[in-house]
């Protein structure tokens, strides 16, 4: 196939809203000769379609991704930060932001997604407090903990040493988190190695550390501060951060753990502010799209030593 033809086909896959049907296959069957079976491709990633889902022919992977995103009202940050990632069979798991954008572009209907069925008859209020206590037991900072830390650093200019203290505390928190503790050693190492920078950002925001990394970091810090988040909010946001899919293309996924954390966050604000959990998830997506290279460069080998000690 010429490069010009290949480019044309790539353009059709990216922009067309009409289901793409490739050349029919000829199946030689002893009972029936020359039966033609047209193969319809997924409108989102180009994989083989398994039928119409939410109004558009898609594969099971893209339809399931669309359903989870709509049900949980998830907001994702772009993997590259420009909103123009290629979504195909090989790269569909890399950028959730561009993938859901393409789902909508191809005409998938969010109103066709049914609410998740449940056989439980108890109310959300009944589940909320016991569930949160179960996962957060012993991990929420007390008022005295915060005062002690503030006192220890009150007389000193904020420098990398205080940031490293927060990093160590954040990783200790992760190791004691019940949803993390049950994972395999490989899964634990993967999370610590890939998620520590953004986890550290949340720890710095939570403790209102006045440290300037770059302009974007300062903007994010101000946004988190303006929401006046509780310790419970930060607890669940840290849980969501560590279980969110990473940029490195790893096959490790933590959908169950992620769903639990998001569900608890939604329950936390069910009565007080139904829109707050949505704003928090949107802001968390913005944090995930933030490049932490400057922060990592600032901490250099000292951070590496701390991270490695937790593997």
Curated annotation (Swiss-Prot):
Residues 39-115 bind DNA. InterPro entries: NHR-like_dom_sf, Nucl_hrmn_rcpt_lig-bd, Nuclear_hormone_rcpt_NR2, Nuclear_hrmn_rcpt, Znf_hrmn_rcpt, Znf_NHR/GATA. GO terms for molecular function: nuclear receptor activity; RNA polymerase II cis-regulatory region sequence-specific DNA binding; zinc ion binding. Residues 116-311 form the NR LBD domain. SMART domains: ZnF_C4 (SM00399). The keyword Zinc applies. Belongs to the nuclear hormone receptor family. This is Nuclear hormone receptor family member nhr-111. It comes from Caenorhabditis elegans. The lineage of its organism: Eukaryota, Metazoa, Ecdysozoa, Nematoda, Chromadorea. The gene is nhr-111.
């Amino acid at each position: 196939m010429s490069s010009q033809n290949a480019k044309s086909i790539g353009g059709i896959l990216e922009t067309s809203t009409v289901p793409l049907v490739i050349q029919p296959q000829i199946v030689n069957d002893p009972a029936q000769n020359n039966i033609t079976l047209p193969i319809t491709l997924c409108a989102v990633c180009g994989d083989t379609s398994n039928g119409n889902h939410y109004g558009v022919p898609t594969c099971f992977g893209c339809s399931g991704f669309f359903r989870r995103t709509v049900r949980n009202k998830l907001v994702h940050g772009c993997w590259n930060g420009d909103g123009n990632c290629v979504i195909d069979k090989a790269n569909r798991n890399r950028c959730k932001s561009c993938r859901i954008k393409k789902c909508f572009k191809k005409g998938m209907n969010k109103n066709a997604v049914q609410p998740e069925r449940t056989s439980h008859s108890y109310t959300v209020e009944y589940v909320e407090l016991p569930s949160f206590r179960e996962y957060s037991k012993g991990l929420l900072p007390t008022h005295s903990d915060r005062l002690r830390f503030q006192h220890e650093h009150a007389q000193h200019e904020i420098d990398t040493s205080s940031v490293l203290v927060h990093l160590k505390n954040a990783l200790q928190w992760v190791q004691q988190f019940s949803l993390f503790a049950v994972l395999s050693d490989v899964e634990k190492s993967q999370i610590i190695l890939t998620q520590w920078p953004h986890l550290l950002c949340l720890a710095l925001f939570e403790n209102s550390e006045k440290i300037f990394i770059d302009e974007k970091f300062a903007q994010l810090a101000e946004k988190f501060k303006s929401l006046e988040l509780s310790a419970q909010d930060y607890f669940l946001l840290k849980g969501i951060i560590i279980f969110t899919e990473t940029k490195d293309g790893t096959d490790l996924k933590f959908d169950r753990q992620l769903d639990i954390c998001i569900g608890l966050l939604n329950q936390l604000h069910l009565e007080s502010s139904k829109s707050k959990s949505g704003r928090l998830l949107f802001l968390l997506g913005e944090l995930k799209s933030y490049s932490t290279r400057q922060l990592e460069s600032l901490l250099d080998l000292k951070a590496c030593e701390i991270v490695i000690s937790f593997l």
